[in-house]
C-alpha cells in the first residue's frame, strides 16, 4: 500500500540492525553510504528479525518515522532490503547515488511463492572467473533467488580443486595447447580454461550466503564424465576410451559401475566437497547416461548377472545406491 509523501534518506540517516542481520546492514551500506548503529529518532533504517513472520517473509514500512524492515529470518530481512533498494533511485545500483534520496511512503508485507528459487550456472562448459560469478550472484539477489545450482563438472572439464586428486583440476580444467583435453572451439595451440581453488569456492559460498543464496555444487555422474575419463581413465570401463571427441557425443564418458575403486574415489570427492559447501545437497546430475558402455563392459555385465539386474536403468540405480 502506497501512502502520501516520501521519507528522505540523508547524511544523518543511520542503519540500526539486530546482531544477526549485521551483514545485511553492511551490504546495504555498499549501496547507501550511511553510518550505523546509533539510533536517531525518526531518521533511521531499522533491520530486525521477527519470529512471528514466515521463513523468508518480510514487512517493509516507510513513513515519517523512518524505514523499518522486519523478516522472519535473515533471508526475510534480506528480501526486504532488496525491495527497499528497488524503491530508491536506480543510481544506487551503480554506486553513484548521492544523498539526499527520497523513497515513497509504503506498507508492504511480502513472501515468496516458492521456497526454492534457483539458477543453474554452468561453468564446466564455459569457465567464468570468480568476479563474474559474484556478478551473477548479485543479479540473483536483486531477483530474490535463493539457490545457485553450481554445475562444476561435465564432459568438458573438471573445475574443482581436490587435495587428494590435484590432477583432476590441474589437467581437467584446461583445453587446447599442451592440455590433455582437446579444444572444443578455436585453435589447437591455444590453452584455455581454469578451475576454482577450494579457497575461491569458500569465498563464493560466503559471498552468496550474505545474499541469502545457498550454493549447491554439482559433480555430474555417472555420465557426463568425459573430461575426467581422459585425465583419469581408471574410472572407465575396461576398454580404451576414445579421446577424439570431447563435446559430449562420445558414449565413453561413464563411470564403470563394476569397479569398487570408483566408489572410494567418489567418497573422497564427497568428503572434500562437504568441507567446502555447507549445503545439505550435493547434486550428482545422473542424466543422459549412455548405457551402451556398460553393455560393452564384461565387468558390468558380470555385476548385472550377480545382482540379478535387468538393463542399464537398474545398473544405474545400483550405482546411485
Task: List PLM regions with ranges.
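An active-site-proximal structural segment forming one wall of the substrate-binding cleft
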Residues: 143-148, 201-222, 226, 253-285
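Substrate-binding groove of N-acetylhexosamine-processing glycoside hydrolases
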Residues: 2, 16-17, 24, 203, ...
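Active-site beta-loop-alpha junctions enriched in small/polar residues
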Residues: 124, 153-157, 220-224, 287-289
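Conserved, mostly hydrophobic/aromatic
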Residues: 15, 73, 119, 140, ...
Amino acid at each position: 500500500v502506497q501512502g502520501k509523501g516520501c521519507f528522505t534518506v540523508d547524511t544523518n540517516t543511520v542503519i540500526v540492525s539486530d546482531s544477526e542481520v549485521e551483514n545485511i546492514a553492511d551490504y546495504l551500506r555498499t549501496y547507501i553510504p550511511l553510518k550505523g548503529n546509533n539510533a536517531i529518532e525518526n531518521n533511521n533504517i531499522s533491520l530486525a528479525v521477527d519470529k512471528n513472520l514466515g521463513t523468508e517473509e518480510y514487512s517493509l514500512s516507510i513513513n515519517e518515522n523512518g524505514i523499518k524492515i522486519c523478516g522472519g529470518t535473515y533471508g526475510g530481512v534480506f528480501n526486504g532490503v532488496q525491495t527497499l533498494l528497488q524503491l530508491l533511485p536506480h543510481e544506487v545500483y551503480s554506486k553513484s547515488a548521492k544523498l539526499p534520496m527520497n523513497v515513497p511512503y509504503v506498507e508492504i508485507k511480502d513472501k515468496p511463492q516458492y521456497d526454492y528459487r534457483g539458477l543453474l550456472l554452468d561453468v564446466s562448459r564455459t569457465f567464468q572467473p570468480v568476479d563474474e560469478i559474484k556478478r551473477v550472484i548479485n543479479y540473483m539477489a536483486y531477483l530474490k533467488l535463493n539457490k545457485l545450482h553450481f554445475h562444476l563438472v561435465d564432459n568438458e572439464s573438471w573445475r574443482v580443486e581436490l587435495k587428494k586428486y590435484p590432477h583432476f583440476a590441474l589437467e581437467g580444467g584446461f583445453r587446447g595447447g599442451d592440455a590433455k583435453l582437446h579444444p572444443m572451439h578455436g585453435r589447437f595451440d591455444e590453452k584455455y580454461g581454469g578451475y576454482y581453488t577450494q579457497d575461491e569456492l569458500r569465498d563464493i559460498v560466503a559471498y552468496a550466503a550474505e545474499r541469502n543464496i545457498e550454493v549447491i555444487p554439482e559433480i555430474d555422474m555417472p555420465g557426463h564424465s568425459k573430461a575426467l575419463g581422459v585425465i583419469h581413465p581408471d574410472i572407465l570401463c575396461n576398454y580404451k576410451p576414445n579421446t577424439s571427441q570431447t563435446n559430449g557425443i562420445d558414449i565413453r564418458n561413464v563411470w564403470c559401475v563394476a569397479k569398487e575403486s570408483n566408489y572410494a574415489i567418489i567418497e573422497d570427492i564427497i568428503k572434500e566437497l562437504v568441507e567446502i559447501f555447507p549445503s545439505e545437497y550435493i547434486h550428482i546430475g545422473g542424466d543422459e547416461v549412455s548405457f551402451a558402455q556398460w553393455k560393452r563392459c564384461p565387468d558390468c555385465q558380470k555385476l548385472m548377472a550377480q545382482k540379478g539386474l535387468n538393463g542399464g536403468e537398474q545398473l544405474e540405480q545400483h550405482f546411485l545406491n
